[in-house]
Amino acid sequence: MKFVDVKNDIAFRKIFGNEQKTLILISFLNAILKLEGDQRIKEVTIINPYLLPRVAGEKASIIDVRAKDEKGQQFVIEMQVADVDGFDKRVQYYTCRDYSMQIDRGEQYPLLKPTYFIGILDFSFFDSPAYLSNHLILNEQTYEHTLKDIRFTFIELQKFHKTVTELQTLTEKWIFFLKNAENLDLIPENINDQGLIEAYKDADKHAWQKEELIAYDNASIAEQDERGKIIAAEKKGKIEEKEKVVKRCWQKKMPIKDIAEISELTIEQVQAILKKLEKQ
């Protein structure tokens, strides 16, 4: 077996947006949200099922998987591979929007059902070392949890370091799958949950159609391009900041040697920036 990178947009939607295998999504939600007893999800309806892009290279129109359970509760599961500006604002905006759009004007508020956002992040976002975190609306003084309809759960893959032999809970096994499936050749022996087993089977490249593999490769290229843009933007921002430091120091008549030390640049780099500033 050769597994795909589950973090890939096409792979993610194919596995979790499969209307024929909703047990995959049910298992994932119950494990990540740690639902027990009557709270456990028994059925889900996928609102935006998996579809291939219409043309080669087209960005997938569905970047997440949305579903409802038998109680009407909404779930938004999103894979985010890069830390883009405003990510936290967007998450809150779209989750609250989905919550409010459950009813039309004039309908009663009690019809609103809880909305859960699950963000799978391939980068570190919070300062905490925890790889799984839940964010609720709590009373600041008493920590009372009365406002329960909106909840955010984040999985930060870069903070998860357990090996396959260290996996104990189904939650850990799901997160291991998300992060490491592409590096495996077989389904781990300690995987006994049927939903997760089916997820591994759907992640097997040998079971994919040619069109799906092409779309998968296109999505991988698009992802690398996007990461490259972000890195380039960060690099440009750092260079511009260095130039500002050099300019301020030069205006204060500081020696080039001191400017280089303060800006953490070489003397040659400082001189090049000064020449550039002279031409402006």
Positions of PLM-derived features:
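Elongated, amphipathic alpha-helical interaction scaffolds
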Residues: M1-Q280
